[in-house]
Amino acid sequence: MQQMVPASGYDRAITIFSPEGRLYQVEYAREAVRRGTTAVGIKCKDGVVLAVDRRITSKLIDVSSIEKIFQIDDHIVAATSGLVADARVLIDRARLEAQMNRISYGEAITVEALAKKICDIKQAYTQHGGARPFGLALLITGIDRHSARLFETDPSGALIEYKATAIGSGRPIAMEVLESKYDENMTVNEGMELALYALSKTTEELKPENIDMAIVKDSGKLVEKISVDEIEKIVKAVYKKVEAEEAEAEKNKGEEDIE
């Protein structure tokens, strides 16, 4: 875990810049995201995929009550990592913005427009006294009238569009997997397998009941939550692939030792 540099008093208010031009409260908010659950988003040729490891810490928790992927509109879905309460506030605001757009303009809001509105809210909370930044990152994705879109929002209000990305504690490992395995021509089914493969590398054991997953396909342009049974099938396929890779690596190592 990256150590935070002493702030020398410049972290006492959100509106104070350090001599290096840093806003420490924003950096602390990013630290909350780095400690959050891992979420993966992948843009495919026929849709988009979101998957989150809900990281259940107790057998007494009702898994169905832990939600990490939220439907914003018929065609937009979002995954969160960071402070749960902050997520609830921004998700409610995102849903409100989507409905206001339908009422005002008679059409669905685009993924980019919604992402920008959420980032405007996040940015406002970095420059007003008496408030703090949202300790939360969002992956906002969906299908609009243009194409599949996938955006990542930062606690500072920064907005970046990706082909595939990850947020949360497992981001570094998941990004390595995505950078090496991602293919722009992969299907949604292949994207679901890659998303779970990336998550499997960030945890000791990938349990289907702990995974939250949703897709939006070009054909229907509607958010679809993936069932636990379907996730279980994909997880089994992922672990078969992992076992095959480990066997191949062991074989190659043995051949090198012989040489």
From Swiss-Prot:
Keywords, ordered alphabetically: Cytoplasm, Proteasome
Keyword Cytoplasm: yes
Activity regulation (UniProt): The formation of the proteasomal ATPase PAN-20S proteasome complex, via the docking of the C-termini of PAN into the intersubunit pockets in the alpha-rings, triggers opening of the gate for substrate entry. Interconversion between the open-gate and close-gate conformations leads to a dynamic regulation of the 20S proteasome proteolysis activity.
Membership in a protein family: Belongs to the peptidase T1A family.
Keyword Metal-binding: no
Gene: psmA
Coiled-coil portions: none
PROSITE patterns: PROTEASOME_ALPHA_1, PROTEASOME_ALPHA_2
Superkingdom of origin organism: Archaea
InterPro entries with a match to the protein in the record: Ntn_hydrolases_N (IPR029055), Proteasome_alpha (IPR050115), Proteasome_alpha-type (IPR023332), Proteasome_asu_arc (IPR019982), Proteasome_asu_N (IPR000426), Proteasome_sua/b (IPR001353)
Subunit structure: The 20S proteasome core is composed of 14 alpha and 14 beta subunits that assemble into four stacked heptameric rings, resulting in a barrel-shaped structure. The two inner rings, each composed of seven catalytic beta subunits, are sandwiched by two outer rings, each composed of seven alpha subunits. The catalytic chamber with the active sites is on the inside of the barrel. Has a gated structure, the ends of the cylinder being occluded by the N-termini of the alpha-subunits. Is capped at one or both ends by the proteasome regulatory ATPase, PAN.
Principal subcellular localisation of the protein: cytoplasm
GO biological process, one term: ubiquitin-dependent protein catabolic process
GO cellular component entries: cytoplasm; proteasome core complex, alpha-subunit complex
Protein name, per record: Proteasome subunit alpha
